[in-house]
Amino acid sequence: MCIRDSLAVVAAGAFTLPRTGGEESPAHTSVASAGPSASPTTSASASAPASAKAERLAALLPADVGEIEEVSLLALIKNATPEQARTTYLGPLDGQYAFRKDGGVGYLVLTLMDREALERKMGRPADPAEDLCARIGQEPARDDCVREVLPDGRTLTTWHDSMDYSGDDSVGWGPELVGRLAQSDGSQFLVRSSTGFEGSGTQGPLLSEPPLSRQQLKKLLTGPEVLPKG
């Protein structure tokens, strides 16, 4: 598996059953986005109840993104048990969320990975200055790729992925917007704003477009609410 595909799988929840005993097993609690003017829950712990995480996320987003529910893609697609689907998260809003709008269901997957975890997955040292828009070897080019160096030195890269490649035959993913925020300490936020999937475990038709736009992803990833406290 190439580096690009490896990190995409990580962001999707790595559809293999993990070891049990992790931190979280998402409860299926839906909340409607109240828009960025709403006050988020005061607790920002990564182990907060799933409903509180969905509420905090919804408070950061425009009201028109739809109804938000924290889910487990492993449970949906692979029928994982709650114990098998438990995941340890680094960021207070890390998780997998369903977005329901206009009869369709899309997904947002947000994952903060530290340098060590990235290096294990990539098989090489993490480089915060790497240009992800540059084609490497035989990897496919990233469509509509935009790389932005932020004033604080972090680098945000976003691109579109048609998801038109072979994988799990039981699931067909729709197009998505992908984001990677590289931080100076070597950690990275990985995010997928997906139009959804069809096949095993589907919750509804694909959305006509990713649930969060490029600008909405940027605002979310660069805000303090997604960073661990302390």
Predicted regions span which residues?
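Intrinsically disordered, low-complexity prosegments and terminal tails associated
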Residues: 8-230
